[in-house]
A protein has these predicted regions:
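Membrane topogenic/interface segments and analogous intrinsically disordered interaction regions
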Residues: 1-300
Length: 300
């Protein structure tokens, strides 16, 4: 029987695990999570050549899906600046073990991405038994929500943010005599950072839920500073878009704005739930006080 199930049964029976037992359970959770990462890393390394050709190097070619969609959008709207049909740069490896090192690093990153749902589930199954019944009810489906948001952010970073950033950096030119010859480590590092950063950024509703639950955040604060948040989002979109066209900035700003609005709704829902729980608890205490024969108020 898994250790977390034993803990839940023990909690239900009024028994508590010792500190050593908690550490033992956490150790096995970590071992299982690391094992999953290792398995996916090995699989990624086995197929690393196909992964580089079809996935990692795909945004460096003008026939990438995002570039083709932008060209279609440019034809439809008449905004020629949106169309990306030329990426004037070369990739090279300047170290003897450069390509092998990048193969290992890329395999590890891919292993982390694919093992994330299971690794988070292992962490969650350790935390969940220690929550109150009301907290478990509110956080039901946490693994599903976190995984969905993270993977959505990864896809957004790969298909939207990374291609726009690559195009901007590849076509930025100080002088025609300067040729762009990027090292493979720089290219892979850029895609990895942007993709993982977007995956974490898409956790904004989850962060809003946690902060609202512990009382550090409320929907009134988020609504009050909504305009400030929109300005930050627009600045961020302007930095990574390939041209000053408004449409290209909107492509990046829209999902981030939507996430902020969803976070406001999440915070409001948490606040409403906390008020309902407080009222229910107060009513329960009042009923207990009235039913207590030793309570002077019950004799009146």
């Amino acid at each position: 029987m898994p250790l977390d199930q034993e803990f839940e049964q023990g909690t239900a029976n009024g028994d508590e695990m010792t500190f050593i037992e908690h550490l033992e359970e956490l150790r096995w959770n970590i071992i299982r999570a690391v094992s999953a990462i290792l398995v996916f890393t090995i699989l990624a390394f086995i197929f690393i050549e196909e992964i580089y050709d079809k996935i990692i190097l795909a945004p460096s070619r003008p026939d990438f899906w995002t570039y083709r969609m932008l060209c279609k959008l440019a034809d439809f709207t008449g905004a020629e600046g949106l169309c990306i049909n030329k990426l004037d740069f070369e990739l090279q490896s300047r170290e003897m073990a450069g390509q092998f090192t990048m193969a290992l690093l890329s395999a590890v990153i891919i292993g982390l991405l694919f093992a994330f749902p299971y690794a988070f589930w292992e962490i969650w199954r350790f935390i969940k038994p220690g929550l109150k019944p009301s907290e478990r009810k509110i956080s039901r489906g946490a693994v599903l929500y976190v995984t969905f948001l993270f993977m959505s952010g990864v896809l957004f970073g790969y298909y939207v943010v990374s291609p726009l950033a690559i195009n901007f950096l590849a076509n930025f030119q100080l002088d025609p005599r300067i040729k762009n010859q990027f090292d493979i480590t720089s290219y892979v590092g850029l895609i990895s950072v942007l993709t993982l950063a977007c995956g974490l950024t898409f956790q904004l509703p989850v962060v809003a839920f946690v902060l609202s639950k512990i009382g550090f955040l409320n929907p009134r604060f988020m609504r009050e500073y909504r305009r400030h948040a929109f300005v930050v989002i627009l600045i961020l979109a302007a930095v990574i878009t390939p041209s000053p066209d408004v449409l290209s900035q909107v492509l990046v700003a829209m999902p981030l704005t939507l996430l902020y609005e969803i976070s406001i709704l999440v915070s409001a829902w948490v606040e409403k739930t906390k008020k309902a729980e407080a009222e229910l608890e107060a009513k329960q205490e009042e009923n207990d006080a009235l039913s207590n024969p030793w309570n002077p108020e019950s004799d009146m």
